[in-house]
Amino acid sequence: EFLAYAEELRPYIADTGVVLDEIFSEGKNVLFEGAQATFLDIDHGTYPYVTSSNPTAGNASTGSGIGPRYIDHVVGVVKAYTTRVGEGPFVTELLDTDGPGHQIRETGHEYGTVTGRPRRCGWLDAFMLKYSARLNSLDCLAVTRLDILDKMPKIKMCVGYKIDGQEIKQIPASLNVLAKVEPVFEEFEGWLTDITSIRTFDELPVQAKTYLNRLSEVAGVELGIV
């Protein structure tokens, strides 16, 4: 019975690496899209609170069967705020039940697609983003869900970490140390207007542009898509 199924599937199965190599030899481009997030990476994430694979950019090569030299542009996709599913460290998490954390969750419908479990929400951690930019060799950022912050009068962004009152330069490798860090926040004025119909960066309110430009500055990566 199952061998019959195999014959039905045979025309759709091939060595992906070979297929992609032929496409590249024709001068065509291929877009690879990853899932999950850098800090869920089994090698570079917040182990043991990780997934079982490598969601980082390098897996575009190992997962597809192409050589790493074929990858010549990497776009980092990041929400305008930070979320996490399940357990694990979350430096900028908002634990309120009726404040900005709740507002982000409800406005952004931040609930698990399959389980319906509420996602943990917090202010954007640009310090983590800086680590991710280095690890993934990001060329630019694609910032999503900026409109979820439309009704926020004040917006915060984490631009660094402190331990015992002293700022640190890198994210600690030890979860025990990471649990002790305090976020260094910068506060921004909200734009308090609906931006969902805006289609160019220049049309954005000045407050939104200020927020995005600071995000780019801290991460060390230019904005590519908003």
Where in this protein do the model-derived segments appear?
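Non-transmembrane, aqueous-exposed alpha-helical and coiled segments at domain scale
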Residues: 1-226
